């Protein structure tokens, strides 16, 4: 690629010699500009792959810039991301790596990641898991998010089982299905329902939405592992790799 640009530069220089008798930095006149435009046009037609390479380089540059910007935001929002008391936490509370998931209980991709997360929890006891409720898919998602956060509020030791059951639900999320899962996981439906109405629950959901917006998270699932942001569903192998990379930093 450099050779091509060098060839283009040499060709341009040679073409401009008749028009540039002095080394003074003077603006191109109309005739010179036209000559350059024709030269570039003809060269790019003969070597269109240069445009593809330039587009790829631009995309890579923008991706790297976005990643760097998000990392700065993560550093600035560290406390809000990792240490909100209303946010459920599982695994080793003093773990050497923190894995944060933004999720919606109705999200099919979130459900598809559940087995990988369950396996990771079983095989690696040094991870701190942070669960960020971001209901995006309508009233049922909001209802489920309230239930999850309320379970954490009234019985944190029973949250994880309830969360897994709710995420693994194959049928539609309704108030009846949510309360039935609560009963099965040792939660008092009345206490849960009362806690769901607590204004602090909706406030926590609003904070999560604001946080997701700040981090430019527009869909679920999304993960933050250490300092790495990962949008979309990931498999167990990818999660293991991300954890290993976070530990290696």
Spans of model-derived segments:
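Ser/Thr-centric signal marking residues that sit
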Residues: 11, 98, 220
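C-terminal cap of thioredoxin/glutaredoxin-like
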Residues: 5-6, 25-41, 61, 180-249
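A short beta-strand-turn-helix
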Residues: 79-97, 121
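N-terminal targeting signals for export/organelle localization
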Residues: 2, 19-78
